[in-house]
Amino acid sequence: MWVGERITEKGIGNGISIVLVINIISRLPQDLSNLFEQFVFGKAPATAILAVVIIFAIIIAMVVLVIILNDGVRKIPVQYAKKMQGRKMVGGQTSNIPLKVNTSGVIPIIFAQSIMQFPIIICSFIGYNGTGVWAEILKGLNSGYWCKPSQPIYSLGLLLYIVLIVFFAYFYTSITFNPLMIADNMKKQGGFIPGIRPGKPTSDYLNKILNYIVFIGAIGLIIVSVIPYFFNGVFGASVSFGGTSLIIIV
């Protein structure tokens, strides 16, 4: 924290973010080493080359997806009616309401992970490993057991994780973006969306578009966050570099 604050004070950038990025990037060489050791080294030349191509293709695809999530915007056109102020005609301007594809950022993933890990942390703190059904529930909440072909039942925890991501994507967006307030402000300022009546119809229209965009963003977050678990579970890879890390870096 202290180092991050000093970086911010010197004007280099957001200190905390820079520290997080450095910490995340420092794990990349080890993750790549683990992947190459498992899928490339000791394999036939053709198999090794194919593995390298697939690994880097997946990495590039994830980076592109995260960039789209972070920078993708749906612009809703807004037009302002002309009106007389004194002897001058004012208004008639055009603007837009930018709706980001990933309105909630990395928050849904962080909240979902925190909720999934909370029971495990509490049990670990009190020294309780669980017995019977509770032990199975704890395994289902542990991402280390997800996507394993030999233990498919524990992947139900992954389904819960996905549901939580979708829930928090909508929940966080509903807190930070209020279509009704925006529609009221537009109406007061003489603004309107072409083809949509001011007031509640505008609010309903914005809410409809927002729900669609949030769903797309949530699907993107799910893909980015689940891929590392899939590789770790199905192929036994040791990848600590997750979707959260990639979103923070980009």
Feature map (PLM): residue ranges:
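N-terminal cationic and glycine-rich segments that engage phosphates or anionic surfaces
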Residues: 1-250
